[in-house]
């Protein structure tokens, strides 16, 4: 995985 994908997933769950 890429850091950007990890961040995107985390952002989605945080929201």
Swiss-Prot record:
Keywords associated with the record: Stress response
Q: What induces it?
A: By water stress.
- Misc: On the 2D-gel the determined pI of this unknown protein is: 6.2, its MW is: 21 kDa.
**Name used for this protein in its record:** Unknown protein from 2D-PAGE of needles
Q: Which organism is it from?
A: Pinus pinaster (Maritime pine)
């Amino acid at each position: 995985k890429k850091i950007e994908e990890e961040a995107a997933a985390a952002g989605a769950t945080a929201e």
